């Protein structure tokens, strides 16, 4: 998102999936560190010390727990799928990217009006049952990006591209077809 705002001339279109917007005073923060229901990994990421450890050592059980928290349909939270997620986390650069999202204040002092600067056609996809990023954050995109389509999927959590890949792919294809 930051790149889009800093380099609008390089962006032809934008697709945001389960994306956070900005912090708004009084709004529920789904990914709260203090939330007892949040996965252990999220709580560990709130500490500089444990972030450094997680850069080199990421236990598989954290991927399992994170997966269970991320999806709505718990039947999808299989060991095989958790293993795949763990393998993705171990890819070069993945841990650094994940940890950077939890380092410092991702939101800054920006207000939702900053999204009015986005001129590229934008598709926003969000699961209504997302436990990590409040689905209400998508309303900031809808209210402020001039050319935006927002798709909210019912009975879907934080990972619509895994929980309903066919629908997600169709919506992305349809979006791309409209901007050609």
What do the PLM-derived regions correspond to, one by one?
Residues 1-2:
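Glycine-rich nucleophile elbow surrounding the catalytic serine of serine-hydrolase chemistry
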Residues 5, 12-52:
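Flexible "cap/lid" loop of the alpha/beta hydrolase fold
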Residues 8-11, 119-120, 147:
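Active-site acidic short loop of glycosyltransferases
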Residues 15, 123-125, 151:
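Conserved hydrophobic packing residues within short motifs/helices of P-loop NTPase cores
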Residues 26, 51-117:
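Conserved alpha/beta-hydrolase catalytic His-Asp/Glu region
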Residues 118, 124-126, 130:
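Short beta-strand/loop motif that positions the catalytic acidic residue
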Residues 131-137:
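Conserved alpha/beta-hydrolase "acid-adjacent" motif
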Residues 146-180:
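Catalytic active-site module of serine/aspartate enzymes centered on a nucleophile-bearing elbow/loop
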